[in-house]
Amino acid sequence: PYEKIGAELVKEVAKKTDDVAGDGTTTATVLAQALVREGLRNVAAGANPLGLKRGIEKAVEKVTETLLKSAKEVETKEQIAATAGISAGDPSIGELIAEAMDKVGNEGVITVEESNTFGL
């Protein structure tokens, strides 16, 4: 039963990460699996589950705070192209994304669909 709960938790983490960020599902899944595994191990060793939960919540707050402090705004077309190129693993795709974002503006929506046609 614990394994099923853990598996459902990991699936939900991946889905939420994809819905909110559109990226990072592998990292979120690995982190969730580690939290479940280590949490169960600690509870089995006698740790208080509520104490573990409070510790995890404090750690999440600290990590979030640290990430927000180190985050950098991506504003220019060149910055968008560089960031998107890294995420896509291809600078030319980064350029396409930056161009599309330039055309639709900050409030615009860009839909990307997979194509079966070579080169498109």
From Swiss-Prot:
Primary localisation category: cytoplasm
GO molecular function terms noted in the UniProt entry: ATP binding; ATP-dependent protein folding chaperone; isomerase activity
Record bears the keyword Hydrolase: no
GO BP annotations listed: protein refolding
Top-level taxon of origin: Bacteria
Residues that coordinate or bind ATP: 23-27
Keywords: ATP-binding, Chaperone, Cytoplasm, Isomerase, Nucleotide-binding, Stress response
Reactions accelerated catalytically: ATP + H2O + a folded polypeptide = ADP + phosphate + an unfolded polypeptide
Record's GO cellular component terms: cytoplasm
InterPro entries to which the protein is assigned, alphabetical: Cpn60/GroEL, Cpn60/GroEL/TCP-1, GROEL-like_equatorial_sf, TCP-1-like_intermed_sf
4Fe-4S listed as a keyword: no
EC number of the protein: 5.6.1.7
Subcellular compartments: Cytoplasm
Family, per entry: Belongs to the chaperonin (HSP60) family.
Quaternary structure and partners: Forms a cylinder of 14 subunits composed of two heptameric rings stacked back-to-back. Interacts with the co-chaperonin GroES.
Function, in words: Together with its co-chaperonin GroES, plays an essential role in assisting protein folding. The GroEL-GroES system forms a nano-cage that allows encapsulation of the non-native substrate proteins and provides a physical environment optimized to promote and accelerate protein folding.
PANTHER family for the chain: 60 KDA HEAT SHOCK PROTEIN, MITOCHONDRIAL
Name of the protein described by the UniProt record: Chaperonin GroEL
